[in-house]
Amino acid sequence: MAADHYVYVLSCADETLYTGYTTNVERRVAEHDAGEGAKYTRGRTPVELVHTERFDSKSAAMQREHEIKSLSRAKKERLVADETG
């Protein structure tokens, strides 16, 4: 069985947004919260998961991660609001 691939957005303690890729969202968020995630999120804990998208392939997920990372903060906030609103 092939693994699912996810793109996720975290809200950091300093009110910034971080976008990443993983095959296990729960584990990855826990790593970020423990200071074991990306250098960017270290010192910006706690983090809160605010958006996820699932993909069947790593390449599709990585492409979407790149797209989200290129968005302005306002567009990222709209993306998050669309999911939670």
Curated annotation (Swiss-Prot):
User: Where is coiled-coil annotated?
Assistant: none
Pfam families reported in the protein's UniProt record: GIY-YIG
**Which Gene3D superfamilies does the protein's record reference?**
GIY-YIG endonuclease
**Stretches the record annotates as Disordered:** 58-85
- What InterPro entries has UniProt attached to this entry? GIY-YIG_endonuc (IPR000305), GIY-YIG_endonuc_sf (IPR035901), UPF0213_domain (IPR050190)
Q: Where is the composition biased (Basic and acidic residues)?
A: 58-70
Ranges for the GIY-YIG domain? 3-78
Q: Which family does it belong to?
A: Belongs to the UPF0213 family.
Q: Name the chain's protein.
A: UPF0213 protein NP_0776A
Record the organism.
Natronomonas pharaonis (strain ATCC 35678 / DSM 2160 / CIP 103997 / JCM 8858 / NBRC 14720 / NCIMB 2260 / Gabara) (Halobacterium pharaonis)
